């Protein structure tokens, strides 16, 4: 038996920082380079490896992604449905739920998906991708994907980590394209959030999206009975 003396002072702080860093980097917050959380990146990478032009069962995609994502099938399935509902990177088939009504998607064995043409053209390039070993060392996965489009702004994101949170509102696809062209030409541009579900927004205190900025969104909520609230506009 080996007995070792250790200093307790500072140990909990180091443990907390290690855990916080792991949650931030591996679970909750997207990478600014491609706008994707690790589970989203691994889903897209798996779908690219499976790509043959045909739809795949979501259950099959989830199982394939588990080669790279060690946190269970439920988190993968939920993330895949959220990606599909944004109607940008994934071509969906079947009942994928409805973001307007809040209806959930059908079970993974009943719905299918494949990468959209936009994703195939914009997201992947093996020659410029930096790779790392997967969690068990059996496969390689991308550190980030070489996305040629500001996905972080297009999709928006909400993530809560240990001691850190991120919330970026979604933006309009066409406005992002126009802003990207102006940026490349070194021209001035204004860019504000947009919502798929519609509604009115006050951006007078947006602060160009920097910390401390705020937006005000009008919502119409009706009380039907003691158990039901209907959101008519947001």
Residue ranges with predicted function:
Residues 4-212:
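Catalytic phosphate-handling regions of large nucleic-acid enzymes and associated NTPases
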